[in-house]
Structure formats: structure tokens, C-alpha cells
């Protein structure tokens, strides 16, 4: 389904001969729960792999993950499923450091500054220590830089590269 990046455009798109909005209304009447679009994630890649954690039924669970990849489709499916499980478990903030909001980085740095001051470090020591902690935080918080839970000797990016694919994006939704 390739239609655009606004909720209204997606609702008007056709899926299996019906509009997405109609499919949603049918699901509401079948399940008995009101549902609305709250978030929209646009992913670009040749292959998009899905994973539902703690699935109650097919496609329904507490955590849903989509991973977009480029490269050989079979290899992308295989590594994509593992990466999706990793995302469900680790809940990264962004794909890369560039995707982490500046206010999040500033807030983390403030925490490190506070910790260093509590430990009685000098002003120069506070700045030096907090500046070393921010890159560590970014490495642990971004998907491609995280240690891969399925092989902790490698990062997610290294594992994808070895599989001959590139991870171009992901979306994680939890209820």
C-alpha cells in the first residue's frame, strides 16, 4: 500500500477492493472496540517485514513492529524478522543518531551533568565526563548502533550488512 503520508490519504486508499476507512469500520463492528488512526509511520524500502509481540491472534498483540529494508527479498525477510524482534525488545529512540531529537540529547546531558556534580567532580571534570556519556547514550539508543540481541558480538547494522541488506527505517507501536 503506497499512498502518501497523511491519515486522510491513507483512509481513502484502497485495500483489497475497499477503502482503508471501510476496512477499519468493519474491524470496529467485528471487534466491538472503537479504533482511530493516532499515528502514521511512513517507511521506505524494498521489503517491509512485520512482527507482533505477544500476539493474541494473527496480527494483533501488545507491540507491533515494521522494519523496512533494501536488498535481496529473502535475506531481508529473514534478518528483518530478527531485527523487528530486536526493536520490540529494545525500543530504540531512532534509526541513527541524527534521528534523536535535540531536546532528548540535551535532557540526557543535563542528567549526566547532575550526576557528575553529585559525585563532586570539578567543573572541567563535569563537562568532560558528560561529553563522554552522550555518545554512549546515543549508541545504546539508536537501532543501527545497538548490540544485536540475537548476536551481541555485532551491532544491528553489522548484522544487516553481513546479510547483504540495508535497514532503511522502522516503526514500533505499543498498546
What do the PLM-derived regions correspond to, one by one?
Residues 1-175:
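N-terminal assembly/interaction segments in proteins that build large macromolecular machines
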